[in-house]
Regions:
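Internal alpha-helical scaffold of NAD(P)-dependent oxidoreductase catalytic cores
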Residues: 100-110, 125-158, 163-207, 248-256
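Glycine-rich Rossmann-fold phosphate-binding loop(s) that bind the pyrophosphate
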Residues: 8-9
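Catalytic nucleophile loop
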Residues: 12
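NAD(P)-dependent Rossmann-like dehydrogenase/reductase catalytic/cofactor-binding core
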Residues: 194, 198-256
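Extreme N-terminal starter segment of soluble prokaryotic enzymes
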Residues: 1-4
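Aromatic pocket-lining residues of Rossmann-like dinucleotide-binding sites
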Residues: 19, 23
Length: 256
């Protein structure tokens, strides 16, 4: 199988890194040269990675085509490419839906939308796909955990939550900086904070079969530090603000 990536940003770099370090069987990966620095770095790093002369060469040469460009670029270039029937197109573009992709491609190809995140480089994290596709499911299960979505409208909810990645890192950064301001060395602060949140996340995964509200309750003791923390953040409308932000992102996606 030959895999082609149109667009060479952070997500392409993460996905390609994950693929090359996984047990996925493939002949080669062909990259566009849109971001030549990223493309060259991946080519130097992995022997099966090559750089294409142009996007059409990728479409001509590969069985699976991954679209990893911005919506603005996608709307401009996809309709200019000449796809072949029976190719598989996996789109990472958040604001171009299936109907728009089908119209732009104009050929009978299998189209799947996917939402990979940077931790895919270490073969961690969820990868929602829509519509369900067994081959694509098996592929991403080797890079993380595939989540199949039948209703495309529902997929926008997952796209919205993917917008919480930078806010999460900003939370880690804020708490880490708080420790640094109080005399803790930055390396120690970051090691403690990242280790703490990894442990909390893993605990949540283990207990994910029950409602997460019980973890909120179980992590508090009467008049304890965690009770104070969650009460004050609720009073400051922190979680309401979080939900409003998710609603705002979803509203943007639903306009497509």
């Amino acid at each position: 199988m030959k895999l082609g990536f149109i667009g060479t940003g952070k997500i392409t770099s993460s996905v390609v890194t994950g693929i090359c370090r996984s047990k996925i069987s493939f002949k080669k990966i062909l990259l566009s040269s849109r971001n030549r620095n990223v493309a060259k770095k991946l080519k130097r790093k992995f022997r099966k990675v090559f750089i294409a002369k142009n996007n059409q060469e990728i479409v001509n040469s590969c069985n699976w085509i991954f679209l990893a460009v911005t919506p603005k670029v996608g709307k401009k270039i996809i309709s200019e490419l000449k796809f072949r029937p029976n190719q598989k197109v996996i789109s990472f573009i958040a604001t171009i839906n299936l109907a728009q992709l089908k119209k732009a491609i104009g050929k009978k190809v299998k189209i799947v939308r996917a939402i990979p995140l940077p931790p895919i480089s270490i073969r961690k994290g969820p990868v929602p796909i829509c519509p369900p596709d067994q081959q694509v499911k098996n592929f991403f299960n080797k890079l993380g955990t595939t989540v199949e979505i039948k209703n495309e409208k529902l997929s926008n909810n997952f796209w919205s939550v993917s917008g919480m990645m930078a806010p999460f890192y900003e939370l880690l950064n804020t708490v880490s900086n708080w420790l640094v301001k109080r005399g803790v060395k930055r390396d120690d602060a970051q090691k403690y904070i990242t280790s703490l949140f990894v442990a909390l996340s893993e605990d949540a995964v283990v207990n994910s079969r029950k409602d997460l509200k019980y973890l909120v309750k179980d992590s508090q003791t009467p008049k304890g530090l965690n009770e104070q923390g969650v009460k004050e953040l609720r009073k400051a409308r922190f979680y309401i603000s979080l939900e409003k932000t998710l609603n705002s992102i979803l509203k943007r996606l639903n306009k497509v």
